[in-house]
C-alpha cells in the first residue's frame, strides 16, 4: 500500500 513500502509502496 501507500505506507506498506515492502508490499507495494505505490498503492499496488
Swiss-Prot record:
Key word Transit peptide present: no
Any single GO BP term: defense response
Location of Leucine amide modifications: 12
Gene Ontology cellular component annotations, sorted alphabetically: extracellular region
Expressing tissues: Expressed by the skin dorsal glands.
Superkingdom as given in the UniProt entry: Eukaryota
Cellular compartments annotated: Secreted
Keywords: Amidation, Amphibian defense peptide, Secreted
Function: Caeridins show neither neuropeptide activity nor antibiotic activity.
Protein name: Caeridin-1.4
Organism field: Ranoidea chloris
Lineage of the species this protein comes from: Eukaryota, Metazoa, Chordata, Craniata, Vertebrata
Amino acid at each position: 500500500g501507500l505506507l506498506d513500502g515492502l508490499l507495494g509502496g505505490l498503492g499496488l
